[in-house]
């Protein structure tokens, strides 16, 4: 990889912030707590223990990249889904089709560089405004090309359903696919939008 004999095509499964403390969950990890006495420690004094084995997530829907994309865009060093390549790609002919509650997005990817390589397309959805708490975008699908030689192309297909757009409504105790116009974002990573498509859901 370092000598460019192999072209990397992996993507980050997490967000790298500028500072560890930029993670919302850092407020809960690690922390000191007072241990509980057990039967065999009846006379043992209570003691402070440094918690390193688990953490408590209190972010709600803003776990991981959702928090950084929604509320901390300026704190990102490398975004979720980021990756490098020794070549370049052009995306074109994005289209959306629907069959019942199932959706399909197709996209043509062309290697415009001078080395063989693979490209990854990530499909995010941005929901219409509502009373439900939602992040600014959520990953719904992704696809990867085969190895493309310079100048060659491939058509990728990304599929998802209306249920994948649903959010939990506590007042109904159910997942609900909200009506309205969603923005489908075809991204290189969670922060880099290449093109968008509208999707309208009706009851």
Feature names for model-found ranges:
Residues 124-126, 174:
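Short, solvent-exposed amphipathic alpha-helical segments in soluble enzyme
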Residues 1-118, 124, 179-187, 203:
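Secreted, periplasmic, or luminal enzymes acting at the cell surface/secretory milieu
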């Amino acid at each position: 990889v370092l000598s460019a004999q192999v072209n990397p095509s992996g993507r980050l499964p997490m967000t790298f912030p500028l500072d560890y403390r930029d993670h919302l969950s850092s407020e809960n990890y690690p922390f000191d707590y007072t241990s509980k006495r057990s039967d065999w420690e009846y006379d043992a004094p209570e003691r402070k223990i440094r918690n390193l084995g688990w953490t408590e997530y209190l972010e709600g829907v803003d776990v991981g990249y959702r928090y950084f994309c929604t509320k901390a865009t300026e704190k990102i060093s490398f975004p979720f889904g980021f990756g490098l390549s020794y070549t370049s790609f052009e995306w074109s002919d994005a289209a959306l089709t629907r069959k019942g509650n199932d959706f399909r997005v197709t996209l043509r990817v062309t290697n415009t560089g001078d080395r063989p390589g693979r490209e990854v397309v990530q499909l995010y959805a941005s929901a219409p405004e509502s009373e439900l708490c939602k992040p600014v975008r959520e990953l719904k699908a992704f696809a990867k090309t085969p190895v493309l030689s310079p100048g060659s192309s491939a058509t990728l297909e990304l599929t998802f359903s209306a249920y994948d757009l649903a959010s939990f409504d506590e007042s109904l105790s159910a997942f609900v696919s909200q009506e309205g116009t969603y923005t489908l974002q075809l991204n290189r990573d969670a922060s880099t939008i290449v093109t968008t498509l509208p999707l309208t859901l009706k009851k």
